[in-house]
């Protein structure tokens, strides 16, 4: 199911991300959701329709297991885009009446149907911590899969980025859908390869699907959505002209390059996010702080949206192929134009109405992009976000996929009741 076959539009594509004659249909947030979807896979082709709210496809609530990754809690303030995505999806599905159980780490939001399986495992910075985390996560995902196998679920949504749920999926009667949020990495790839022939995988952008095509020839694409009410439109920036950068403060996000680019453009910069890599902070960020560069801390969702909406421009400086670009989507939803390195999915999000792209890792070119982006029309930014990133549409698409997977799974009375067929 995809996002963007061109720089200027997002498509829904169910079928190979690359290959012959994929069935495509433009599905913007403002377009009637009546398209027919089809795909070619080893198992029977999926044919499903989008209703104004796809939850109407279910006669009764569905019992859904969501397997989160365990490194950080699924709670505000979010450590990153995956935590926010998992939180919103669980919340939205529960709001639609489904019975959601979220398997996640301690500290996650309790009213999401939480089953807390371990303390947050965090990120590794050396071989010893990596080995410790690997062991903790393996034991935790074993416990999760034991519970899922006994839980009587209709569908399992796997957001874990861990191979073990994939390798044990055959032990579960319910079908599993696995979302791809990152480029291929070991050992997750081992699990994906093991189930590539008989499981549905959905990447969060077309560019990410293309990266996975080397090991997974037919990934679907379901683009991420954002809460357009939380990231509300702000027609006028606040205060003196300034830029903002948000995200995890880690080398692959490149905040040190954003600082240098803002200075090159002559704009003060404020930035926010968790200090996820102390060594990187001490060596590359702390020495760059000054009167024109201010660290705001790790902000709540509401405070983050307010500060983004007040800014004159957002910088996005990834040093990897950005799988989706959630920061970009949130910024334009607030009406704040974006200057960004043209990496990964970002060129699929930004067009000339809402952002300016720069050459990857080129600080001077990013400074140029900052100067040009400041003058873009804020309402055009918001309209672009509304067209591409309505989270309710994302939820519709996942519901439609769940329904199709349940239809093609081994029939059970529980599935039939949920679909209104018993």
Regions found by a protein language model. Name each.
Residues 21, 28, 33-40, 44, ...:
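Catalytic cores of nucleotide-sugar-dependent glycosyltransferases that transfer UDP/GDP/TDP-activated
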Residues 8-17:
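N-terminal, intrinsically disordered, basic low-complexity segments enriched in Arg/Pro/Ser/Thr
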């Amino acid at each position: 199911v995809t996002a963007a076959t061109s720089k200027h539009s997002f498509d829904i594509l169910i079928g190979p991300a690359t290959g012959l004659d994929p069935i495509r249909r433009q599905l913007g947030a403002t377009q009637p959701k009546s398209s027919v979807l089809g795909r070619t896979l080893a198992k029977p082709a999926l044919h499903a329709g989008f209703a104004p709210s796809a939850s109407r496809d279910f006669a009764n609530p569905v019992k859904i297991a969501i397997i989160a990754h365990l490194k950080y809690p699924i709670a505000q303030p979010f450590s990153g885009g995956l935590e926010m995505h998992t939180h919103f999806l669980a919340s939205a599905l529960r709001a639609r009446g489904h019975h959601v159980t979220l398997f996640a780490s301690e500290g996650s939001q309790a009213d999401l149907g939480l089953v807390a399986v371990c303390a947050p495992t965090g990120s590794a910075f050396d071989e010893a911590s990596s080995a410790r985390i690997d062991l903790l996560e393996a034991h935790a995902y074993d416990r999760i899969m034991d519970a899922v196998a006994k839980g009587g679920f209709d569908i399992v949504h796997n957001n874990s980025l861990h191979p073990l749920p994939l390798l044990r999926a055959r032990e579960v009667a319910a079908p599993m859908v696995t979302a791809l949020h990152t480029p291929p990495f070991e050992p997750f790839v081992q699990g994906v390869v093991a189930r590539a022939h008989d499981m549905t995988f959905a990447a969060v952008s077309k560019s990410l699907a293309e990266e996975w095509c080397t090991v997974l020839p037919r990934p679907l694409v379901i683009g991420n959505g954002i809460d357009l009410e939380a990231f509300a439109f702000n027609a006028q920036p606040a205060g003196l002209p300034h830029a903002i950068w948000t995200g995890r403060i880690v080398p692959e996000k490149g905040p040190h390059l954003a600082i240098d680019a803002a200075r090159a453009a002559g704009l003060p910069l404020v930035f926010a996010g968790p200090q996820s890599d102390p060594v990187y902070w001490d060596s590359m960020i702390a020495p760059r702080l000054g009167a024109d560069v201010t660290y705001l801390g790790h902000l709540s969702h509401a405070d983050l949206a307010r500060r983004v909406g007040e800014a004159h421009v957002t910088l996005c400086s990834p040093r990897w192929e950005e799988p989706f670009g959630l920061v970009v989507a949130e910024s334009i939803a607030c009406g704040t134009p974006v200057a960004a390195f043209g990496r990964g999915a970002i060129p699929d999000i930004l067009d000339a109405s809402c952002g300016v792209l720069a050459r990857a890792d080129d600080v001077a070119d990013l400074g140029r992009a900052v100067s040009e982006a400041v003058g873009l029309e804020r309402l055009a930014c918001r309209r672009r976000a509304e067209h591409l990133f309505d989270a309710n549409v994302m939820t519709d698409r996942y519901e439609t996929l769940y329904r199709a997977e349940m239809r093609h799974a081994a029939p059970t009375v529980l599935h039939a009741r949920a679909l209104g067929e018993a």
